C-alpha cells in the first residue's frame, strides 16, 4: 500500500496515554488508525466492502512512521489491544527517509467540510451524510483559517487547497528538480524559480528566439545524457527556454555549452587534466589583492586622452582611456578548502560565461576564466513573486503541463571539446551552414558573458507575451504569432512595408550568409563570424561623393574647406539600405576611405580676419570676386601631410593686416543691372531683397549677442573698434594675453544649473605648451587661433550650458595631451558658440575635423579599432554642422551621420561592455567561505577595498560613456532625420548597450571616493560582477523599454525605474517610428500613384496614427511614473528648471504631437536648404486639412506657452539671459510656423467672407476658442519678451511695413475686447474687423524671431529667422483663397 493518502500524514510520535485515547470519541490527531472514525471511509477498498454497516464505521489501516523505538512499541501494543482485527505494520527509520515529525495533538482545527473533495493521487474520499468537518493543519491556519485544505503533505502535514500546490511542495522533500534552464543547465524545483533565474542571469537571451530563424534539423536527436533523467519533454509551449525532466534530482544537467553536465569545480579539474594531457601550461593567478587602504598612483597620460581605464581584454579595443593598471585576480590559498556552493535561484555554471572557440589552444587558454565565473549571485530577488506569476498564469487558463509530446529535435555540436582536427573542420562547416545563431556577440578574447547555445523554439507566444497580452498591441490588435518579434520590437522595424508592422528588424535575420575563414586569421574570423551572424544585411554600398563642393559660402565668411573639415558627403546608397549590426569584414572597406578623402588636401581655408575676434554672427555675403583655387585630385604622396598641415595656415589669403576680398555691406555686393530684361530685373530684385534680409538679421542677432556679452563680462565691447593687429579680446583685469586661465563671470546661476551637472572643479584643459604644440601640428599662426585663456573659458561654457543637456563625455576623466586634443578642440568649439564667437568656433571646428580625419586614416583598414573619443569628437562636430546656417555643410550631414553610425557598429559600441571585457570584480561569492570566518571577512574587505572600488568606478564610467554616446547619436540622428525627412537614423533596435543610470550623480562623480560614498548613500552593494554589470548598464535594457512602448507591458511598468534621459531617448524612438510610418505610407501610396500629400495623409491616418497615439500614451505613463512633468505650472517650474532633461522633453514631446497631425518634414527641409519659395508652397500643401491644422495648433500653442513660463520664471529670478537648448529652439520655430499658418487661414476667411452670400461659411466655434487662446498666449509672450521701455527693432519692423504698412500692429489687444469679438452672439462684422486688425499671423512670426534672438547661439537660428521673415512677407503680399 502506497504511503501517500489523505490523513496519513498525522504526527506519528504517539505519547498519549490509553485513558486519553479512550476519551476521544471520533478524532485523535496523533493516531487516526486506532479508533473508529465515523466521518472517514477506510483507505483500502477491501475494508470498505467489509465494514460494519450497522455503525457505518470502519477500522483504518495506515502505516505510521516513528523516530523513537519505545514509541513504536507502545503504539503497537495499543494497536493490538484496541484493534485486534488489524495487522498493523510499521517501518523502521531507515526505510522512511527524511521525515519531519514535529507536531503535537493541537496541530489540527475542525472546520466545515465541502460537500465532496477528490484526491487525485491515490484514493477518493466521500463524506458520509450528516458529517461536515475536516482537519486543517496548524501550519496552514496562519495563512487562512476559513478555507479547507484537504491536500496534506505526508511529510510535514502542511495543507494545500489544490493538488498541484501539493505536488510543487513535495519537491522540497523529494529533492526533485524537474525544471531545467536551457541556457546553462541549472535545475530547479519550481518553474517560477527558473523564470527568475533567467531574468537575472540570462535577461539578454530570454525572448531572443524566433521561430523563423531557428529551424531545427528534422533528423537530429537530442543528446541530453539520458542516464541523468527519466524522460525529457517539452514544457508548456509558452515556455521557450524551460525544459521539464520528470524525476530529476541533479543540480545541473548537460547543455550544448556544458555537455558533461559538470559543476564549476568539476570543470576546473577537467581543464587541468585536459591541459596536462595536451602539455599546455595554465596561467598562474595574480597574487591576493591587498586589503590595506592605498592611494591610487597618479595616472599617466593615456593615449586615448582619458584617465586610467584599462581591462584585461587582449585583442579587443578599449574605447575610453587606458593606463598601466591591470585588473588583479584574487588568489585563494590552496589549503583553504571551499565548501560546496549553495543551490541559488540565479546561480549558473561557469561554462555559461565562456565563449566557444574552434581552436583547441584557445579552448584551453580560455578556461582560465572559469575561476572568474560566478558561483552564487547575491541579488536573486525576483522581479515577480511566484504567487504573482502563478496567479497571472492561472488567469490565462493555460493547458496543464504534460510530458506527452517530446521536444523538437535539435542538433548539438558534440565536437565542442573534441581535439580532433577533422571534428574541428566539421564544426566550422556546421557553424557556417547553420542558420541559427546567437544574438550575443563573442569577443575576441573569449570572455563573453552568458553566450547561449542552440536552444529550443516554439511557434507559440512566450510566457511574457501571454502575461502582457491586452486588447491593443500598440494599435495592431493584440499579439500575432505569425509576425511576432523576439523582443516585441517589430513595430520599430525599419524594413520596407511589404508586410505588417511586426516584421523582424534587420538585427534578427531570417537567413545568415556564410563566410569562409582562412587558417591565417581563423581566430579573428571566428569572432567576426558570430558577429556577422547578427545581421542579415548584404555588404553595404560604398559611399561615393557626388560632386563634393570645393567652396562653401555663408553669411559670415567664405571658406574653402580642407580635407575632413566639413565632411561633405553625398552617399549613393541603395534605397533599402538598413542600419544594423554590421560586420566590419562584410562592409566595403572603401566607405571610410571615401569619407576621409571627400575633399581636396590642397584646398584652402579662407576666413575674414578683419572680424576674427568680433562678437556675434558677422555678416559677409559670398563674393563672386573671391579667388578660390579649383579642387585638385587627392594626393597620397609623402608631401600630402604637409599640405594637410598647411591647409589651416593664414598664409593663404589669411593675412593679419585686415585686408579682405569680402564686401562689408550688401550694397557693395549687388548693383542694379544695366540690362532692361524684366525677368532678369525681377530675379535680381529678389536676390537683393534676400541679401538685405540676411544683412538685417545678422545685425539684429549680432546686436543681441553683443548686449548679452556686455552683461556677462561687465564691459563695453564694440566690434568696430577691435584691434585687428592684436587679434585678442580685451577682458577686464587681463594684462597678459598668454595667461594660463582667466575666470569669467558665471554665465549660469546655481538655480538654473541642474543638480546633476558636473561639480565645479578647477580643471585646466588648455595650457600654453599644449596650445603651442597644437598650432605647430596644424601649421597655424598664433594670431589666427584663440588664446589659452579663451580656450579655457570656452570649456567652462561647455560645462555649464551644453553638458547638462548632453552629458555623453565624462569630463573629469579627460587628460589633456596631444593624443586626444581633437576632443578638446571640439569641446571648446561648442563653448565658443555659447561665448558668441562664431568665427573662433569655425576655426576650432576645422582644426578638430582635420585631426579626426587623420585619426580615422590610421584605423582605416580596421574601423573596429576606432576609439571612443574619436566618435565623441565626431558627435560634437555633427552638432555644430547640423545646426549650421551653411547649406552645403548641412547637405553633407547625411553621409557624416551614416559614417558615425557605421563606426558605432563596427567598433561594437552599441553592445554591452561585458561582451568585450570582463568586469573587474572577482566572481567567488562571499558565501563560498561561510565556514571560514577569516576568509569570509577578508573577501568582504576586498569588495570595499579602495583599489577594487577604483576599478569598479573605471568600469562604470567606461560603460556609461559608451551608452551615453550611443544615446546621443540616437538623439541627434533621429531628430535630424525627423526634421528634414532624411534616412540616416541610428535605429533604436540596434541600441543594445543599456540605458543611462537612474542616479545621474553616479556618472558625474569626479573620482572613485565620491562614487563610493554615493553607493553607500543609495545602499547599492557591489558583491559580484553581475551587480556591477547591472549598475553599469543602467539596471535595464533598452529593448525592454521599446517593448513597453509597443505592448504596454504592465510588468515593466510596475517594476522598471528609468531615468529622465532614458525617457528622452524613448521619445526620440517615437519620432523615429513616426518617420518610419510616414515613409511607409508614402511608399505604399506611390506604388500606384504619384506623389500626393493628401493620399499619403489618408494612408497615415488609416494605418499608423493609432499606433503612434498608443505609444505616446504608454510613454506618458512611464514618464510621469518616474517623476516627469508635462504641463509647466507655477509650482513645478523650479523642478523643471532644475532638470535639463525635462527642459528638452517637454518641447520634443509636443513636437511629436504636432508631427502626428502634420507631416512637417517637407517644410523644414526647405528651410534648412534656404529654399524659401518652395517652403511657402510646401507649407500650404501640408496644411490642407483644417482639422489636422487645428489640432497641431493646439500643441504648438502649448509649446509657446511653456516657453513663456520658462522665460518668466528666469526673469523673476533677475536673470536677463535664458539660453534655450538647441533642440527646443528647433521645436519652437516649427510651432511658430504652425500657429502662423492657422492664423493666416482664419484671416483669409475673414477677408473672403461675404455677408450677402448665403453659402458663405461661418467661423466654427472651435476656431473662435482657438483664436482667443492664441491671442491670450501671444499677448502674454509679448508682454514678457518685449518690455514696454524697449523699442522694437526697426530693421525688421520697417522692412515688413515697407511691404504693407498695416501688416504688423504690435499693440496688444484688450482681453475683454477680444472675448466680446469671439462671442457667437456678436455681430460677424465686428469679429471680422478684429481678426483682420489683430493680424496674429504676422505678429506670431515677429515674436518667433524675438524668441530666436533670446538665445542667439547656434548659427541655424539665422536660417530660422530668415524663414520666418520670408513667410511674413509672403503672407502680407499674397491674397489667398478661403479654406474654411
From Swiss-Prot:
Compositional bias ranges of the Polar residues kind: 544-569, 652-681
Keywords: DNA-binding, Metal-binding, Nucleus, Phosphoprotein, Repeat, Transcription, Transcription regulation, Zinc, Zinc-finger
Residue(s) carrying Phosphoserine: 231, 322, 544, 632
GO CC annotation: chromatin; cytoplasm; nucleus
Gene3D superfamilies hit by this protein: Classic Zinc Finger (3.30.160.60)
Low complexity bias locations: 424-445, 624-634
Biased composition (Basic and acidic residues): 575-584
Keyword NADP among UniProt keywords: no
Zinc finger feature spans (C2H2-type): 151-173, 179-202
GO biological process: DNA-templated transcription; regulation of DNA-templated transcription; regulation of transcription by RNA polymerase II
Subcellular localization(s) per the UniProt record: Nucleus
A Pfam family recorded for this sequence: Fungal_trans
Region annotation Disordered: where it falls in the sequence: 208-231, 413-445, 544-584, 624-643, 652-688
InterPro entries: Transcription_factor_dom_fun, VerF-like, Znf_C2H2_sf, Znf_C2H2_type
ATP-binding recorded as keyword: no
GO molecular function annotations of the record: DNA-binding transcription factor activity, RNA polymerase II-specific; RNA polymerase II cis-regulatory region sequence-specific DNA binding; sequence-specific DNA binding; zinc ion binding
Biological function: Transcription factor that regulates expression of both nuclear and mitochondrial genes, and more specifically those required for glycerol-based growth and respiration.
Family designation: Belongs to the RSF2/TDA9 family.
Protein name: Respiration factor 2
Organism: Saccharomyces cerevisiae (strain ATCC 204508 / S288c) (Baker's yeast)
Lineage: Eukaryota, Fungi, Dikarya, Ascomycota, Saccharomycotina
Gene: RSF2
Amino acid at each position: 500500500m502506497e504511503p501517500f493518502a489523505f490523513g496519513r500524514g498525522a504526527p506519528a510520535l504517539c505519547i498519549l496515554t490509553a485513558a486519553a485515547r479512550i476519551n476521544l470519541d471520533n478524532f485523535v490527531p496523533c493516531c487516526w488508525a486506532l479508533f473508529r472514525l465515523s466521518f472517514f471511509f477506510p483507505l483500502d477498498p477491501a475494508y470498505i466492502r467489509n465494514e460494519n454497516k450497522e455503525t457505518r464505521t470502519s477500522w483504518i489501516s495506515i502505516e505510521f512512521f516513528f523516530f523513537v523505538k519505545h514509541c513504536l512499541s507502545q503504539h503497537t501494543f495499543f494497536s493490538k489491544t484496541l484493534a485486534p482485527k488489524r495487522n498493523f505494520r510499521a517501518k523502521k527509520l531507515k526505510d522512511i527517509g527524511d521525515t519531519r515529525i514535529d507536531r503535537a495533538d493541537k496541530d489540527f482545527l475542525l472546520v466545515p467540510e465541502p460537500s465532496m473533495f477528490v484526491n487525485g493521487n491515490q484514493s477518493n474520499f466521500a463524506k458520509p451524510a450528516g458529517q461536515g468537518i475536516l482537519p486543517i493543519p496548524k501550519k496552514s491556519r496562519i495563512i487562512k483559517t476559513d478555507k479547507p485544505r484537504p491536500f496534506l503533505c505526508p511529510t510535514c502535514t502542511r495543507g494545500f487547497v489544490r493538488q498541484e500546490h501539493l505536488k510543487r511542495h513535495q519537491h522540497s522533500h523529494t529533492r526533485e528538480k524537474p525544471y531545467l534552464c536551457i541556457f546553462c543547465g541549472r535545475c530547479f524545483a519550481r518553474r517560477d524559480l527558473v523564470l527568475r533565474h533567467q531574468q537575472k542571469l540570462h535577461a539578454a537571451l530570454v525572448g531572443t528566439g524566433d521561430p523563423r530563424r531557428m529551424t531545427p534539423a528534422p533528423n537530429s536527436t537530442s543528446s541530453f545524457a539520458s542516464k541523468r533523467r527519466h524522460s525529457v519533454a517539452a514544457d508548456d509551449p509558452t515556455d521557450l527556454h524551460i525544459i521539464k525532466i520528470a524525476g530529476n534530482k541533479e543540480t545541473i544537467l548537460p547543455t550544448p555549452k556544458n555537455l558533461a553536465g559538470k559543476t564549476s569545480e568539476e570543470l576546473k579539474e577537467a581543464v587541468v587534466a585536459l591541459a596536462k594531457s595536451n602539455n599546455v601550461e595554465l596561467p598562474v593567478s595574480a597574487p591576493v589583492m591587498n586589503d590595506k587602504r592605498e592611494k591610487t598612483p597618479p595616472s599617466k597620460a593615456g593615449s586615448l586622452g582619458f584617465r586610467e581605464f584599462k581591462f584585461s581584454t587582449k585583442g579587443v579595443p578599449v574605447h575610453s582611456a587606458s593606463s598601466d593598471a591591470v585588473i588583479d585576480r584574487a588568489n585563494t590559498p590552496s589549503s583553504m578548502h571551499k565548501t560546496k556552493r549553495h543551490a541559488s535561484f540565479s546561480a549558473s555554471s561557469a561554462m555559461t560565461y565562456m565563449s566557444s572557440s574552434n581552436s583547441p589552444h584557445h579552448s584551453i587558454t580560455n578556461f582560465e576564466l572559469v575561476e572568474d565565473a560566478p558561483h552564487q549571485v547575491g541579488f536573486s530577488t525576483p522581479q515577480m513573486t511566484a504567487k504573482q506569476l502563478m496567479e497571472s498564469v492561472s488567469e490565462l487558463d493555460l493547458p496543464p503541463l504534460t510530458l506527452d509530446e517530446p521536444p523538437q529535435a535539435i542538433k548539438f555540436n558534440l565536437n565542442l571539446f573534441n581535439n580532433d582536427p577533422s571534428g574541428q573542420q566539421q564544426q566550422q562547416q556546421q557553424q557556417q551552414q547553420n542558420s541559427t545563431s546567437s544574438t550575443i556577440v563573442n569577443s575576441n578574447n573569449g570572455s563573453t558573458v552568458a553566450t547561449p547555445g542552440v536552444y529550443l523554439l516554439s511557434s507559440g507566444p512566450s510566457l511574457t507575451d501571454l502575461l502582457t497580452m491586452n486588447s491593443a498591441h500598440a494599435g495592431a490588435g493584440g499579439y500575432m504569432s505569425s509576425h511576432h518579434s523576439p523582443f516585441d520590437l517589430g513595430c520599430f522595424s525599419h524594413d520596407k512595408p511589404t508586410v505588417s508592422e511586426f516584421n523582424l528588424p534587420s538585427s534578427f535575420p531570417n537567413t545568415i550568409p556564410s563566410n569562409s575563414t582562412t587558417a591565417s586569421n581563423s581566430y579573428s574570423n571566428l569572432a567576426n563570424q558570430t558577429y556577422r551572424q547578427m545581421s542579415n544585411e548584404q555588404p553595404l554600398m560604398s559611399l561615393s561623393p557626388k560632386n563634393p563642393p570645393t567652396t562653401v559660402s555663408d553669411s559670415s565668411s567664405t571658406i574653402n574647406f580642407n580635407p575632413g573639415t566639413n565632411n561633405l558627403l553625398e552617399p549613393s546608397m541603395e534605397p533599402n539600405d538598413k542600419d544594423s549590426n554590421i560586420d566590419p569584414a562584410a562592409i566595403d572597406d572603401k566607405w571610410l576611405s571615401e569619407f576621409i578623402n571627400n575633399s581636396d588636401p590642397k584646398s584652402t581655408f579662407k576666413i575674414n580676419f578683419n572680424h576674427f575676434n568680433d562678437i556675434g554672427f558677422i555678416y559677409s555675403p559670398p563674393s563672386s570676386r573671391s579667388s578660390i583655387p579649383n579642387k585638385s585630385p587627392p594626393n597620397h604622396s609623402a608631401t600630402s601631410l604637409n599640405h594637410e598641415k598647411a591647409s589651416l595656415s593664414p598664409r593663404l589669403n589669411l593675412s593679419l593686416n585686415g585686408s579682405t576680398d569680402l564686401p562689408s555691406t550688401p550694397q557693395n555686393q549687388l548693383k542694379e543691372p544695366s540690362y532692361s530684361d524684366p525677368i532678369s530685373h525681377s530675379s535680381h530684385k529678389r536676390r537683393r531683397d534676400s541679401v538685405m534680409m540676411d544683412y538685417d538679421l545678422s545685425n539684429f542677432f549680432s546686436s543681441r549677442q553683443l548686449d548679452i556679452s556686455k552683461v556677462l563680462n561687465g564691459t563695453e565691447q564694440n566690434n568696430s573698434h577691435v584691434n585687428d593687429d592684436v587679434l585678442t579680446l580685451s577682458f577686464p583685469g587681463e594684462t597678459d594675453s598668454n595667461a594660463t586661465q582667466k575666470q569669467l563671470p558665471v554665465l549660469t546661476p546655481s538655480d538654473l544649473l541642474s543638480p546633476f551637472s558636473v561639480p565645479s572643479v578647477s580643471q585646466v584643459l588648455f595650457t600654453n605648451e599644449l596650445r603651442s604644440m597644437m598650432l605647430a601640428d596644424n601649421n597655424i599662426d598664433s594670431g589666427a587661433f584663440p588664446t589659452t585663456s579663451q580656450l579655457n573659458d570656452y570649456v567652462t561654457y561647455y560645462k555649464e550650458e551644453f553638458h547638462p543637456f548632453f552629458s555623453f563625455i565624462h569630463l573629469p576623466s579627460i587628460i589633456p595631451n596631444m593624443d586626444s586634443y581633437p576632443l578638446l578642440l571640439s569641446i571648446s568649439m561648442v563653448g565658443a558658440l555659447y561665448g558668441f564667437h562664431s568665427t573662433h568656433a569655425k576655426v576650432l571646428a576645422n582644426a578638430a575635423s582635420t585631426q579626426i580625419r587623420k585619426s580615422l586614416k590610421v584605423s582605416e583598414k580596421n574601423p573596429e579599432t576606432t576609439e571612443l573619443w574619436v566618435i565623441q569628437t565626431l558627435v560634437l562636430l555633427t552638432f555644430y554642422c547640423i545646426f549650421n546656417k551653411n547649406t552645403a555643410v548641412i547637405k553633407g550631414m547625411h553621409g557624416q551621420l551614416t559614417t558615425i553610425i557605421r563606426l558605432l557598429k563596427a567598433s561594437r559600441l552599441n553592445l554591452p561592455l561585458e561582451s568585450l571585457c570582463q568586469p573587474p570584480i572577482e566572481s567567488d561569492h562571499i558565501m563560498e567561505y561561510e565556514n571560514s570566518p577569516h576568509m569570509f571577512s577578508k573577501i568582504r574587505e576586498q569588495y570595499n577595498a579602495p583599489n577594487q572600488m577604483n576599478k569598479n568606478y573605471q568600469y562604470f564610467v567606461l560603460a556609461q560613456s559608451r551608452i551615453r554616446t550611443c544615446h546621443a547619436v540616437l538623439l541627434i540622428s533621429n531628430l535630424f532625420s525627423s526634421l528634414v525627412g532624411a534616412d540616416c537614423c541610428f535605429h533604436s533596435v540596434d541600441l543594445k548597450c543599456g540605458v543611462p543610470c537612474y542616479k545621474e550623480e553616479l556618472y558625474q562623480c569626479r573620482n572613485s571616493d565620491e562614487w563610493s560614498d554615493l553607493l553607500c548613500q543609495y545602499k547599492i552593494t557591489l558583491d559580484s560582477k553581475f551587480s556591477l554589470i547591472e549598475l553599469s548598464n543602467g539596471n535595464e535594457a533598452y529593448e525592454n523599454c521599446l517593448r513597453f512602448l509597443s505592448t504596454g507591458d504592465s510588468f515593466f511598468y510596475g517594476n522598471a525605474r528609468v531615468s529622465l534621459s532614458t525617457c528622452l531617448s524613448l521619445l526620440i524612438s517615437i519620432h523615429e517610428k513616426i518617420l518610419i510610418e510616414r515613409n511607409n505610407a508614402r511608399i505604399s501610396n506611390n506604388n500606384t500613384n504619384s506623389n500626393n500629400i493628401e493620399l499619403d495623409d489618408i494612408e497615415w491616418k488609416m494605418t499608423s496614427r493609432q499606433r503612434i497615439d498608443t505609444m505616446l500614451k504608454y510613454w506618458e505613463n512611464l514618464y510621469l511614473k518616474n517623476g516627469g512633468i508635462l504641463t509647466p505650472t507655477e509650482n513645478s517650474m523650479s523642478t523643471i528648471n532644475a532638470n535639463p532633461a525635462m527642459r528638452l522633453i517637454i518641447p520634443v514631446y509636443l513636437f511629436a504631437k504636432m508631427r502626428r497631425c502634420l507631416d512637417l518634414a517637407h517644410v523644414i527641409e526647405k528651410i534648412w536648404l534656404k529654399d524659401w519659395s518652395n517652403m511657402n508652397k510646401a507649407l500650404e500643401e501640408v496644411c490642407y486639412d483644417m482639422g489636422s491644422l487645428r489640432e497641431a495648433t493646439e500643441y504648438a500653442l502649448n509649446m509657446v506657452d511653456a516657453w513663456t513660463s520658462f522665460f518668466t520664471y528666469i526673469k523673476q529670478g533677475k536673470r536677463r539671459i535664458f539660453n534655450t537648448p538647441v533642440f527646443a529652439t528647433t521645436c519652437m520655430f516649427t510651432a511658430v510656423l504652425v500657429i502662423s499658418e492657422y492664423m493666416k487661414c482664419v484671416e483669409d476667411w475673414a477677408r473672403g467672407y461675404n455677408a450677402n452670400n448665403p453659402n458663405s461659411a461661418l467661423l466654427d466655434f472651435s476656431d473662435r476658442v482657438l483664436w482667443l487662446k492664441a491671442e491670450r498666449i501671444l499677448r502674454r509672450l509679448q508682454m514678457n519678451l518685449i518690455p514696454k521701455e524697449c523699442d522694437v527693432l526697426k530693421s525688421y519692423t520697417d522692412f515688413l511695413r515697407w511691404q504693407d504698412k498695416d501688416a504688423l500692429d504690435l499693440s496688444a489687444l484688450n482681453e475683454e475686447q477680444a472675448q466680446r469679438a469671439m462671442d457667437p452672439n456678436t455681430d460677424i462684422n465686428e469679429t471680422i474687423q478684429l481678426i483682420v486688425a489683430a493680424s496674429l499671423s504676422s505678429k506670431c512670426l515677429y515674436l518667433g524671431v524675438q524668441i530666436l534672438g533670446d538665445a542667439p547661439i547656434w548659427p541655424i537660428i539665422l536660417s530660422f529667422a530668415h524663414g520666418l521673415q520670408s513667410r511674413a512677407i509672403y503672407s502680407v503680399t499674397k491674397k489667398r483663397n478661403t479654406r474654411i
